[in-house]
From Swiss-Prot:
LRR repeats lie at residues 56-77, 80-101, 104-125, 128-149, 152-173, 176-197, 305-326, 329-350, 353-374, 377-398, 401-422, 530-551, 555-576, 579-600, 603-624, 627-648. Its main location: secreted. This is Slit homolog 2 protein. Homodimer. Binds ROBO1 and ROBO2 with high affinity. Interacts with GREM1. Gene3D superfamilies: Ribonuclease Inhibitor (3.80.10.10). It is found in: Secreted. Residues 1-30 form the signal peptide. Residues 209-259, 434-484, 660-710 form the LRRCT domain. GO terms for molecular function: chemorepellent activity; follicle-stimulating hormone receptor activity; GTPase inhibitor activity; heparan sulfate proteoglycan binding; heparin binding; identical protein binding; laminin-1 binding; protein homodimerization activity. It comes from the Eukaryota. One of its GO terms (biological process) is negative regulation of axon extension. Thought to act as molecular guidance cue in cellular migration, and function appears to be mediated by interaction with roundabout homolog receptors. During neural development involved in axonal navigation at the ventral midline of the neural tube and projection of axons to different regions. SLIT1 and SLIT2 seem to be essential for midline guidance in the forebrain by acting as repulsive signal preventing inappropriate midline crossing by axons projecting from the olfactory bulb.
């Protein structure tokens, strides 16, 4: 090939790589396939909507999965989405605001799910939606504001549900509707104004319902006769003498009511609020009672007029954002004896009438900032029998009317001064059964309880030893002293993690510091020292430098460095990370792995090196990683593995070598026997060379078939010569012209940009 040809090829490759680099930030969700602006995740048995959907997505296929809930954050930021396919899942709940960001949405399919109710104003942000399929669900009612905001809908399918109530005005905004299917439901009555505002309606199906043809439905007969091409086969199901008659054929005089009903000819569709009661619960007198029903999540779309919700003795784990915000009249909320471990900061937002909140007997460890903000009417707050280990100083700042606060039986070691200052009406407080450290930082509490003898449960000190088991309210102030160790411990336990300074551009929640998707090229300074999980994925790292940052993070257990551009890890980069047990380096640009890269990771159990460019695994690549149990080298460019490469991984129980182009020559013979003996490999890594072994599992190849015949002696683990002996090399240019060569010379540098082979004796293209 001529020099010009190679230069052209080099330029083309550079251009392709440039384009790929620009596309890379639009990562495709795991398991899904992406093409252009289409993301296809159908039929993958997904239980939740996958994360990291590219922001430029215009079509998203999620049909045929096992998704049960659509949260308000699942589609956040997808402002270009036009087509959303959610049919054939198990969706029973859609949170308010779930489609708020979908400003360009045109088609939405939710058919064949388990929807019983959907929130009012769900489609408020989808002004361009023109096709909506909700058929084959279990929808019972269509509330008045169901389609508010979706003014452009032309095709609405609601057939094969259990609809028995359509509130007056439910379809009022749909003036451009052309297709409406309501067949195969439980509809008995419709208000006279239901369809009068649809001048473009050309397809209308109402058959197979329970229409009761009394005086209130006489209007429908006239309406259908005026439109002979729509509403075909719409029949009466009652009264008995009209059963089976086509509504359009029944005469006006036959639509009769009892004497008592005659005076109410102008029938108005009833409120559907009675139908908003979850199937497992009972609803009466504005009380929703769901006690002991095995619920795993908060029921949604309850009657907005409720004043009390009883959800105790269930298996609820998470209280999502705005879970109760629609219920402005709520006065009492009981969530005791569940499994709650996660509370959204705005879980109780807007509950200005709430006076009783019961949360005892759960697994709450921390109260998010602003959790009780705006609860000005609250008088009773029971947080006992949880695992709360810290209180923010402003946790109760709006609870001016609180009478009783129970923090009994938690994990509090200290309470910051001023935490109870806003509780002007407090009469009773329970603080016992907490492991209080009675040092100088808790002196204020003793003074507070001396002045305000409201603590009635007998709160006692656990440490230091000199004050152990003594009642806090009875200890003299001078006894509360700090030694160095106690001072450090109490300072840590008295602060909640989210209150501490978070690095710029990062997000901090609990012990997780999330610095992903911020275009970072180095690890931020001042990572909180109690960080347990550090997320640095989806950034611009090229080299992981040895800065000593991990020496300052004694609690660190997991580091995520996936989806960067890392080509090298400096020796000592992980120095000090002795407690880390999981590192994710998936989707980077590492070409080799050396033991010096992982120095300091004595406790590492999981090492993910998927989707890099590794070509060789040497016999010292993983030296010092004796605790590693899971090692993934999936989807690299590995052609060979040096004997003994995994010998130092004494704890290894899972090894993934799939999707690599293994060259099954004499250098790989040892691996087949090793795989058969160890039985720890995932799947069946296969040979790709030589040709007669292509796609055969390595462990199935006979030892005598691992040969280096016919010039197949490549070993990517051997040091590469700088230049073939037959050629001359200058920088990245290799000249082998007019050398009488019959085969391609060995030892051509991997970084070659120009290769001259003209004037030789090749009979086949090398």
């Amino acid at each position: 090939m001529s020099g010009i040809g190679w230069q052209t090829l080099s330029l083309s490759l550079a251009l392709v790589l440039s384009i790929l680099n620009k596309v890379a930030p639009h990562a495709c969700p795991a398991q899904c396939s992406c093409s252009g602006s289409t993301v296809d995740c159908h039929g993958l048995a997904l239980r939740i909507v996958p994360r990291n959907i590219p922001r430029n997505t215009e079509r998203l296929d999620l049909n045929g999965n096992n998704i049960t809930r659509i949260t308000k954050t699942d589609f956040a930021g997808l402002r270009h989405l036009r087509i959303l396919q959610l049919m054939e899942n198990k969706i029973s709940t859609i949170e308010r605001g779930a489609f708020h960001d979908l400003k360009e949405l045109e088609r939405l399919r939710l058919n064949r799910n388990n929807l019983q109710l959907f929130p009012e104003l769900l489609f408020l942000g989808t002004a361009k939606l023109y096709r909506l399929d909700l058929s084959e669900n279990q929808i019972q009612a269509i509330p008045r504001k169901a389609f508010r905001g979706a003014v452009d809908i032309k095709n609405l399918q609601l057939d094969y549900n259990q609809i028995s109530c359509i509130e007056d005005g439910a379809f009022r905004a749909l003036r451009d509707l052309e297709v409406l299917t309501l067949n195969n439901n439980n509809i008995t009555r419709l208000s006279v104004a239901s369809f009068n505002h649809m001048p473009k309606l050309r397809t209308f199906r109402l058959h197979s319902n329970n229409l009761y043809c009394d005086c209130h439905l006489a209007w429908l007969s006239d309406w259908l006769r005026q439109r002979p091409r729509v509403g075909l086969y719409t029949q009466c199901m009652g009264p008995s003498h009209l059963r089976g008659h086509n509504v359009a054929e029944v005469q006006k005089r036959e639509f009769v009511c009892s004497d008592e009903e005659e005076g109410h000819q102008s029938f108005m569709a009833p409120s559907c609020s009675v139908l908003h009661c979850p199937i497992a619960c009972t609803c009466s007198n504005n009380i929703v009672d769901c006690r002991g029903k095995g619920l795993t999540e908060i029921p949604t779309n309850l009657p907005e007029t409720i004043t009390e919700i009883r959800l105790e003795q269930n298996s609820i784990r998470v209280i999502p954002p705005g879970a109760f915000s629609p219920y402005k009249k709520l006065r009492r909320l009981d969530l005791s004896n569940n499994q709650i471990s996660e509370l959204a900061p705005d879980a109780f937002q807007g509950l200005r009438s709430l006076n009783s909140l019961v949360l005892y007997g759960n697994k709450i460890t921390e109260l998010p900032k602003s959790l009780f903000e705006g609860l000005f009417s609250l008088q009773l707050l029971l947080l006992n029998a949880n695992k709360i280990n810290c209180l923010r100083v402003d946790a109760f700042q709006d609870l001016h009317n609180l009478n009783l606060l129970s923090l009994y039986d938690n994990k509090l070691q200290t309470v910051a001064k001023g935490t109870f200052s806003a509780l002007r009406a407090i009469q009773t407080m329970h603080l016992a059964q907490n492991p209080f450290i009675c040092d100088c930082h808790l002196k204020w509490l003793a003074d507070y309880l001396h002045t305000n003898p409201i603590e009635t449960s007998g709160a006692r000190c656990t440490s230091p030893r000199r004050l152990a088991n003594k009642r806090i309210g009875q200890i003299k102030s001078k006894k509360f002293r700090c030694s160095g160790t106690e001072d450090y411990r109490s300072k840590l336990s008295g602060d909640c993690f989210a209150d501490l300074a978070c690095p710029e551009k990062c997000r901090c929640e609990g012990t997780t510091v999330d610095c992903s998707n911020q275009k970072l090229n180095k690890i931020p300074d001042h990572i909180p020292q109690y960080t347990a999980e550090l997320r640095l994925n989806n950034n611009e790292f090229t080299v992981l430098e040895a800065t000593g940052i991990f020496k300052k993070l004694p609690q660190l257990r997991k580091i995520n460095l996936s989806n960067n551009k890392i080509t090298d890890i400096e020796e000592g980069a992980f120095e000090g990370a002795s407690g880390v047990n999981e590192i994710l380096l998936t989707s980077n640009r590492l070409e080799n792995v050396q033991h010096k890269m992982f120095k300091g990771l004595e406790s590492l159990k999981t090492l993910m090196l998927r989707s890099n460019r590794i070509s060789c695994v040497g016999n010292d690549s993983f030296t010092g990683l004796g605790s590693v149990r899971l090692l993934s080298l999936y989807d690299n460019q590995i052609t060979t593995v040096a004997p003994g490469a995994f010998g130092t991984l004494h704890s290894l129980s899972t090894l993934n070598l799939l999707a690599n182009p293994f060259n099954c020559n004499c250098h790989l013979a040892w691996l087949g026997e090793w795989l058969r003996r160890k039985r720890i490999v995932t799947g069946n890594p296969r040979c790709q060379k030589p040709y007669f072994l292509k796609e055969i599992p390595i462990q199935d190849v006979a030892i005598q078939d691992f040969t280096c015949d016919d010039g197949n002696d490549d070993n990517s683990c051997s040091p590469l010569s700088r230049c073939p002996s037959e050629c001359t090399c200058l920088d990245t240019v290799v000249r082998c012209s007019n050398k009488g060569l019959k085969v391609l010379p060995k030892g051509i540098p991997r970084d070659v940009t120009e290769l001259y082979l003209d004037g030789n004796q090749f009979t086949l293209v090398p």
